[in-house]
Design a protein with these regions (language model features):
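Short, glycine/polar-rich helix-capping loops at beta-to-alpha or helix-loop-helix junctions
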Residues: 24-27, 41-49, 130-131, 170-171, ...
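A short, well-ordered alpha-helix in the C-terminal region of glycosyltransferases
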Residues: 77, 232-246
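Active-site-proximal region of nucleotide-activated glycan assembly enzymes
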Residues: 9-73, 81
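A donor-sugar binding/catalytic signature common to diverse glycosyltransferases
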Residues: 152-194
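Donor-nucleotide binding loops and adjacent catalytic segments primarily
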Residues: 71-77, 81-162, 194-198, 203, ...
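C-terminal alpha-helical cap of glycosyltransferases
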Residues: 246-260
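Conserved acidic donor-binding segment of nucleotide-sugar-dependent glycosyltransferases
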Residues: 208-214, 225-230
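An aromatic- and histidine-rich active-site surface loop
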Residues: 1-11
Length: 260
């Protein structure tokens, strides 16, 4: 986007930026001087951009997620779950997250003993074959193990607790749905922006964060604590829901139309 934005601005074409993360990327910081407006999803972005250009819009999310809260029964049926059990969704994205998968392997025997809990474990296409062979004959009955999620909206709908990376898109979806979440920021991103994304929620009592370097040892204990504490899950859900912005796409579009 850097070269395109620069050429456009130099040619007199109005430039609107969207910064999805709580810590601005290098390209957007360089283009900020030439931009007409800068759409952001987090408070405090005047640290990086001229205050007068900032528009607080949030990040656009998929419209199919808007109905996910009311689709629990459909999700339970789709993923073959028990409606009377609490459900944990563990996801590392389409390719998967190695550290989260290692943590799941580490805690699998413990999870097997959680009789009132079931887990959707989306391991990612990159790790699926290796894990399938490694865990042959060892997968607990209360764990649904899969490389990817065919219906992300229904997986969210089932979940009483989510374990996920802290990418901007994922966080925006979780805010919209009001899901209690354990965020495990990826260390393999520019300027450690996922940790900053996660901390923006933690500081508002809207999420729990486990560092990637600690997730193998800590994840099971954190999950168990939250599953046993309905009050803490409810509090996390209520706080994260206050951060939701449902019409981000429309707000951004209107701002663009104003300068055309």
């Amino acid at each position: 986007s850097g070269p395109i934005g620069r050429v456009a601005a130099n040619a007199g074409v109005p430039l609107v930026l969207q910064e999805q993360n709580s810590y601005a990327g290098v390209t957007n910081k360089l283009l900020a001087k030439k931009a007409e407006k800068i759409c952001v999803a987090y408070e405090g972005m005047e640290r990086f951009f001229p205050k007068e250009k900032i528009i607080f819009t949030g990040n656009p999310v998929r419209k199919d997620l808007l109905n996910a809260v009311s689709e629990r029964a459909e999700g339970i049926a789709f993923y073959g779950l028990n409606a009377n059990k609490k459900t944990v969704l563990v996801t590392g994205g389409s390719l998967g997250a190695g550290s989260i998968n290692k943590a799941m392997v580490r805690w699998l025997e413990k999870i097997a003993g959680w009789k009132d809990v079931q887990v959707i474990w989306q391991c990612g296409s990159y790790y699926h074959k290796e894990l399938e062979e490694q865990l042959k004959g060892r997968m607990p009955e209360n764990v649904k193990f899969m490389p990817f999620l065919k219906r992300m909206d229904l997986a969210y709908a089932c979940a009483d607790l989510v374990v996920a990376r802290a990418g901007a898109g994922t966080i925006s979806e979780l805010c919209l749905l009001g899901k209690a979440v354990v965020l495990v920021p990826s260390p393999n991103v520019a300027e450690d922006h996922q940790t900053k994304n996660a901390m923006a929620l933690v500081n508002k009592q809207a999420a729990v964060m486990v560092k990637d370097a600690e997730v193998v040892e800590r994840l099971g204990g954190v999950m168990e604590r939250l599953l046993q504490d309905d009050g803490e899950r409810k509090s996390l859900s209520e706080h994260i829901l206050t951060l939701a912005m449902k019409d981000s796409d429309e707000v951004i579009a209107r701002e663009i139309l104003k300068i055309m």
